[in-house]
């Protein structure tokens, strides 16, 4: 089985400088939603037809996906013509890249139907109360036709069974049929739909859930489809033992995994391939991207991206964990703390107003409020190492590269530029001077 995904269109009604299929739903570009369904249906040979700003679309595709370019957008039939030389299988499934909600189960069912009765083509159809914008399925005298809306009469426009844009073809039939279609229509395009009328054995299979085949033509429809996807994902998670306090304000990508008894508070975004364990508290007002979070972690009003958080850690409120951050068990990262490309050891804490970049911090370390790792010299980044059981006082600057030895104490307000040996006290600040009574008789204006 080969899948051809049509993704060459401009998408004029999106009024956008980027291709339509690149626009995201719940953090995942539409083209990747379709790819995800195709792969889960067990289809390995995948061809994506690109066109308008092809390089942007192609940059989103995995290496195992083939691409062909439709330099001139001359219709869906022409797009498949461009791709047909890369078809190596007896069956071809054709999908559009702007109908992101198609399920793997529906795709599997479609190719099973084609095989059972050796159809030349099976078309996925559904019924819409408002079919505006879709081609109509016309059944006459045992034959099947698809009429594009732009070419439809008023009588045909009243038909509510619509073409989804998803087809399963016998490869030999498709190759022959593509040679016979023409562009004698209002749009002067080669319609893939015209191949259906050439089939001796064709059927339209009605998909029970019409939302699966909804297409995106403008940003209103993009928002509507995101709302449908959001509802499906959140309901699935809640039925599997996750509490989502307000599903309407919780946005979760389709590949996110969340464990039982985790609570997701309102205004939370969990995106990418994030994995969250059991008994966690996430949110409110939190965004997590492509991160791994173990059991019993709380993340409150914070941002987490490409981070690893081990069990029992506490993050927030108002923390930022940037890519490359690892928090080990029972760490505490508090308000207005930013961590980047650093590992924080077990039971260590940085609870206030701190920046930790390119740092390795051991176990049972206290980072005082206002501590900064000065990791950048204007050219290169340098590492800070703080060993186990150290105590960093408030308002310290650690100028990297620098190492604080095990069990050491850095006095508040210090600027540390040299390594500190284990079990030492380091002070790097000016001596306090008091001139008692200096201003006792100071007159106003002096």
From Swiss-Prot:
Gene3D superfamilies: Hexapeptide repeat proteins (2.160.10.10), Spore Coat Polysaccharide Biosynthesis Protein SpsA, Chain A (3.90.550.10). It is found in: Cytoplasm. Pathway: Nucleotide-sugar biosynthesis; UDP-N-acetyl-alpha-D-glucosamine biosynthesis; N-acetyl-alpha-D-glucosamine 1-phosphate from alpha-D-glucosamine 6-phosphate (route II): step 2/2; Nucleotide-sugar biosynthesis; UDP-N-acetyl-alpha-D-glucosamine biosynthesis; UDP-N-acetyl-alpha-D-glucosamine from N-acetyl-alpha-D-glucosamine 1-phosphate: step 1/1; Bacterial outer membrane biogenesis; LPS lipid A biosynthesis. Binds 1 Mg(2+) ion per subunit. It catalyses: alpha-D-glucosamine 1-phosphate + acetyl-CoA = N-acetyl-alpha-D-glucosamine 1-phosphate + CoA + H(+); N-acetyl-alpha-D-glucosamine 1-phosphate + UTP + H(+) = UDP-N-acetyl-alpha-D-glucosamine + diphosphate. One of its GO terms (molecular function) is UDP-N-acetylglucosamine diphosphorylase activity. Its EC number is 2.7.7.23, 2.3.1.157. GO terms for cellular component: cytoplasm; membrane. The keyword Nucleotide-binding does not apply. Its cofactor is Mg(2+). Residues 220-240 are annotated as: Linker. Transmembrane segments: none annotated. The keyword Transferase applies. Keywords: Acyltransferase, Cell shape, Cell wall biogenesis/degradation, Cytoplasm, Magnesium, Metal-binding, Multifunctional enzyme, Nucleotidyltransferase, Peptidoglycan synthesis, Repeat, Transferase. The active site is at 352 (proton acceptor). It comes from the Bacteria. Acetyl-CoA binds at residues 369, 375-376, 394, 412, 429. Residues 241-446 are annotated as: N-acetyltransferase. GO terms for biological process: cell morphogenesis; cell wall organization; lipid A biosynthetic process; peptidoglycan biosynthetic process; regulation of cell shape; UDP-N-acetylglucosamine biosynthetic process. In the N-terminal section; belongs to the N-acetylglucosamine-1-phosphate uridyltransferase family. Homotrimer. Catalyzes the last two sequential reactions in the de novo biosynthetic pathway for UDP-N-acetylglucosamine (UDP-GlcNAc). The C-terminal domain catalyzes the transfer of acetyl group from acetyl coenzyme A to glucosamine-1-phosphate (GlcN-1-P) to produce N-acetylglucosamine-1-phosphate (GlcNAc-1-P), which is converted into UDP-GlcNAc by the transfer of uridine 5-monophosphate (from uridine 5-triphosphate), a reaction catalyzed by the N-terminal domain. HAMAP family: GlmU. This is Bifunctional protein GlmU.
């Amino acid at each position: 089985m080969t899948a051809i995904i049509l993704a060459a269109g401009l998408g004029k009604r999106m009024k956008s400088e980027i291709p339509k299929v690149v626009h995201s739903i719940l953090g995942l570009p539409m083209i990747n939603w379709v790819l995800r369904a195709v792969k889960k249906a067990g289809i390995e040979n995948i061809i994506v037809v690109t066109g308008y700003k092809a390089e942007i679309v192609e940059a989103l595709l995995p290496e195992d996906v083939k691409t062909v370019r439709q330099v001139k957008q001359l219709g869906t039939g022409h797009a498949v013509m461009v791709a047909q030389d890369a078809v190596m299988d007896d069956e071809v499934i054709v999908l559009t890249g702007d109908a992101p909600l198609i399920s793997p189960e529906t795709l599997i069912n479609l190719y099973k139907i084609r095989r059972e009765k050796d159809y030349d083509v099976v078309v996925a159809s559904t019924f819409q109360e408002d079919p505006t914008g879709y081609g109509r399925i016309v059944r006459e005298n045992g034959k099947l036709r698809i009429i594009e809306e732009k070419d439809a009469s008023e009588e045909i426009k009243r038909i509510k069974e619509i073409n989804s844009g998803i087809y399963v073809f016998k490869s030999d039939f498709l190759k022959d049929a593509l040679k016979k279609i023409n562009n004698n229509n209002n749009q002067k395009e080669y319609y893939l739909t015209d191949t259906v009328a050439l089939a001796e054995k064709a059927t339209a299979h009605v998909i029970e859930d019409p939302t699966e085949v909804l297409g995106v033509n403008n940003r209103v429809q993009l928002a509507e489809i995101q709302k449908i996807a959001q509802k499906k994902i959140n309901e699935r998670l809640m039925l599997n033992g996750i509490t989502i306090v307000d599903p309407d304000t919780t946005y979760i990508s389709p590949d996110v995994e969340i464990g039982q008894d985790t609570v997701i508070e309102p205004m939370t975004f969990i995106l990418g391939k994030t994995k969250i364990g059991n008994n966690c508290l996430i949110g409110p007002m939190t965004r997590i991207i492509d991160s791994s979070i173990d059991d019993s972690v709380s993340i409150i009003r914070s941002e987490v991206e490409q981070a690893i958080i081990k069990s029992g850690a506490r993050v927030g409120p108002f923390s930022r964990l940037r890519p490359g951050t690892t928090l080990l068990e029972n760490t505490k990262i508090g308000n207005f703390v930013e961590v980047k490309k650093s590992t924080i050891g077990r039971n260590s804490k940085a609870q206030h107003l701190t920046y930790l970049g390119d740092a390795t911090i051991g176990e049972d370390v206290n980072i005082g409020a206002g501590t900064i790792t000065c990791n950048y010299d204007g050219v290169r980044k340098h590492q800070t190492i703080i060993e186990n059981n150290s105590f960093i006082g408030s308002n310290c600057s650690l100028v990297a590269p620098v190492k604080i030895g095990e069990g050491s104490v850095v006095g508040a307000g210090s600027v540390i530029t040299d390594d500190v040996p284990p079990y030492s006290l380091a002070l790097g600040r000016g001596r306090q001077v008091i001139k008692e009574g200096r201003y006792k008789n100071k007159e106003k204006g002096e």
